[in-house]
Amino acid sequence: MDDKKKKRSPKPCLAQPAQAPGTLRRVPVPTSHSGSLALGLPHLPSPKQRAKFKRVGKEKCRPVLAGGGSGSAGTPLQHSFLTEVTDVYEMEGGLLNLLNDFHSGRLQAFGKECSFEQLEHVREMQEKLARLHFSLDVCGEEEDDEEEEDGVTEGLPEEQKKTMADRNLDQLLSNLEDLSNSIQKLHLAENAEPEEQSAA
């Protein structure tokens, strides 16, 4: 029977000193915490504190260069832009101004002369050119397929098909030239602005 009691009783760990059976281990707790925490119950840090401990642990693990640090070697690195309230207010004001400019249409894309309306115009021209280009390809493929299926050319005579294809190609080239000119104007306006700033 004594052997069974010995087997059931927990064995004290060799690394920990043996404590008297009736004593509780007291954990020092600040007075701001509730009284129930002073009984030795485990106290888990809040998620905010855990993140802080992780951050401090990571910063301590970072190697410090011999002549590179401006602060002392024992102080953790801090991001001043996260703690400066005036910087946050300044960024907030800048973002609100940007949002107001966007809604009013005054927002400039590349310079004073280049607005989003011009960029929208260029984008629409690009889409129009792409549609025209692919519609020409599709029309050409459909006509070739019809000729192969029928064995005989139906519809328009060859000369009319050729003149229509030439007209579509001329339209495509003129639209492409307009697009090129619009993009060139945007680039010229963008390059002219830094020259004006350097001259002033």
Swiss-Prot record:
The lineage of its organism: Eukaryota, Metazoa, Chordata, Craniata, Vertebrata. Residues 1-10 have a biased composition (Basic residues). GO terms for cellular component: centrosome; cytoplasm. This is Coiled-coil domain-containing protein 28B. It is linked to Bardet-Biedl syndrome: A syndrome characterized by usually severe pigmentary retinopathy, early-onset obesity, polydactyly, hypogenitalism, renal malformation and intellectual disability. Secondary features include diabetes mellitus, hypertension and congenital heart disease. Bardet-Biedl syndrome inheritance is autosomal recessive, but three mutated alleles (two at one locus, and a third at a second locus) may be required for clinical manifestation of some forms of the disease. Pfam families: CCDC28. Keywords: Acetylation, Bardet-Biedl syndrome, Ciliopathy, Cilium biogenesis/degradation, Coiled coil, Cytoplasm, Cytoskeleton, Obesity, Phosphoprotein. The gene is CCDC28B. The modification N-acetylmethionine is found at M1. It comes from Homo sapiens. PANTHER family: CHEMOKINE C-C MOTIF RECEPTOR 1 (PTHR13400), COILED-COIL DOMAIN-CONTAINING PROTEIN 28B (PTHR13400:SF2). GO terms for biological process: cilium assembly. Residues 158-183 form a coiled coil. InterPro entries: CCDC28. Residues 1-49, 141-164 are annotated as: Disordered. The modification Phosphoserine is found at S46, S115. It is found in: Cytoplasm, Cytoskeleton, Microtubule organizing center, Centrosome. Interacts with BBS1, BBS2, BBS4, BBS5, BBS6, BBS7 and TTC8/BBS8. Interacts with MAPKAP1/SIN1 isoform 1 and RICTOR. It comes from the Eukaryota. Involved in ciliogenesis. Regulates cilia length through its interaction with MAPKAP1/SIN1 but independently of mTORC2 complex. Modulates mTORC2 complex assembly and function, possibly enhances AKT1 phosphorylation. Does not seem to modulate assembly and function of mTORC1 complex. Residues 141-152 have a biased composition (Acidic residues).
